């Protein structure tokens, strides 16, 4: 029997120390990784609840275990809320991650060897959309589409490839593409060749909810997303689908890929979805988009090239070649200045994937902590200051001091 009054700090000082160090890092550092955000205390409290103790294989009202009456309520709330958020016919809130949600789509609609048309990872796609080392690339025949000379999705080439290869499934969505995607045109192409049309909005979901990015639900057969990133919920996944695909998708998740769902995480998803239904969340997403525009404009003023020349979302790719620094080196230097970003390949990148010629920058996290246009402009200039002299310790120290002055004015949890 454990002692009920013993908390983490007494039970495991080593883990507690790491948690506290991470808490300090999140408070002091400026977070610009586009896929990261700060979940609310309410979301984290739900995830830390007693629901973690409950096994609940199956779906609400159709469980293989007894005692599921309370988790049924929670899961149904999550389903109903996410359907309302996106205007979807049906939803599955059980995927443990965005990648598992994506795997479920493949399991529901395809057989090994079927052809998929997806965005090239090298030009902004995601590894679950056909990267050779990923399950999607190992099990299926992958045909990739990419960008044109303007670094925009080449819809004409995409259409030609669809007609030539007759894919069973076409994927829209990206992990490093800053522009709006024409989901309606994708849908027309998919319909012409008889393909299932799947959209992955893991990055854009929060913006979609607020009307700041196109909603693919009216056009797609199935839509997947993570629940963290711009949705600002717990780490996990969701699947939205047309009514006729609900049985296939649900069977692909359980028993196809997963057993008992993580009901404590589903509770946190439900809380996050309720938050996302508020006017405050819409205003937050509007500010995310405004901040991204300011960030990109400021970097351009400082002599940096933005891939595609602009952003129409929360994210941007920055080409560092003119500065003579790799993405890997930039990530390290910015980290020393307490600005967190990730290295990222750019289209036709001459560097290896673990080195890269670019960085990816996003505004969801800084907007959550309260940054508006003024603070965003300051942050973009601080980032540019580091890139001007990445090996100058005095420069890094000066930027770090300015970062701390800024973050102390906008605490996350304190």
From Swiss-Prot:
The record marks 228 as: Plays an important role in substrate specificity. Disulfide bonds: none annotated. GO terms for molecular function: glycine hydroxymethyltransferase activity; pyridoxal phosphate binding. Its EC number is 2.1.2.1. Keywords: Amino-acid biosynthesis, Cytoplasm, One-carbon metabolism, Pyridoxal phosphate, Transferase. PROSITE patterns: SHMT. It is found in: Cytoplasm. Transmembrane segments: none annotated. GO terms for cellular component: cytosol. GO terms for biological process: glycine biosynthetic process from serine; tetrahydrofolate interconversion. Pathway: One-carbon metabolism; tetrahydrofolate interconversion; Amino-acid biosynthesis; glycine biosynthesis; glycine from L-serine: step 1/1. InterPro entries: PyrdxlP-dep_Trfase (IPR015424), PyrdxlP-dep_Trfase_major (IPR015421), PyrdxlP-dep_Trfase_small (IPR015422), Ser_HO-MeTrfase (IPR001085), Ser_HO-MeTrfase-like (IPR049943), Ser_HO-MeTrfase_PLP_BS (IPR019798), SHMT-like_dom (IPR039429). (6S)-5,6,7,8-tetrahydrofolate binds at residues 121, 125-127. It is an enzyme of class 2 (transferase). It comes from the Bacteria. It catalyses: (6R)-5,10-methylene-5,6,7,8-tetrahydrofolate + glycine + H2O = (6S)-5,6,7,8-tetrahydrofolate + L-serine. Its cofactor is pyridoxal 5'-phosphate. The modification N6-(pyridoxal phosphate)lysine is found at residue 229. Homodimer. Catalyzes the reversible interconversion of serine and glycine with tetrahydrofolate (THF) serving as the one-carbon carrier. This reaction serves as the major source of one-carbon groups required for the biosynthesis of purines, thymidylate, methionine, and other important biomolecules. Also exhibits THF-independent aldolase activity toward beta-hydroxyamino acids, producing glycine and aldehydes, via a retro-aldol mechanism. Belongs to the SHMT family. This is Serine hydroxymethyltransferase.
